[in-house]
Amino acid sequence: MKFRLAAVAAAALLASSASFAGMVTGSSNIDFLAVDGQKANRSLLKETRSFNINDTHTHQVVVRVSELIREGSDRTLFESDPIVVTFQGSTEDIRISAPRLTNEREANNFKANPKITVKTVSGAEIASKQDYLKQEGFLPGVNLEENLSNYNQSGATASVAGFATASMPATVGTVQNGKVKKGKVTVQGENAAEQMLQYWYQQADKETQERFLNWVKTQK
């Protein structure tokens, strides 16, 4: 009897723990750049736009909103600056979303006053603090963790001191003679666009590199 009671109690405990874990997903126009002070990567994200949390503590994400918008008769890619969003976790799954942007006017309005919504799957809105993440240094997107650490130490609107790293190493080394080195990644070029292409090519997996090279061939 004691064994049976212990088994039932253990099962109940495991069930409650499992139900306590929630998944955070983003709308189709949102990309997660960082989660709780760490740069988002494949090991952190279940998919491109989702990750798990298992508590109701304070959490912080950095997101970018991307949309194809109309500019007259043309269509162009709008990408927002990184936006820091701080919110409390929930035992429910959470959805973080941005409004759909279809034209230049809507994109400009969003840029001037970005609004990211945080809700549980049942529809309850979760209070959040939001702020732009200032981008500094060469290749600011690559320096994301360093910039975010500095932001979290600043006491700004959406900062969380607990996610700041006191001595965050620079992600990209000092530029010397047009070269930037980070481990085995080396880029060299006459302008930032060329250096960015080289950097992201070396960061990509082999399949992505092959798709990119095939695409380049079609552009000639």
Swiss-Prot record:
Annotated signal peptide: 1-21
InterPro entries membership: UPF0319
Organism annotation: Actinobacillus succinogenes (strain ATCC 55618 / DSM 22257 / CCUG 43843 / 130Z)
Xref: PANTHER family: UPF0319 PROTEIN YCCT
The entry's keywords: Signal
Pfam families: DUF2057
Domain of life where this protein originates: Bacteria
Family to which this protein belongs: Belongs to the UPF0319 family.
Name recorded for this polypeptide: UPF0319 protein Asuc_1002
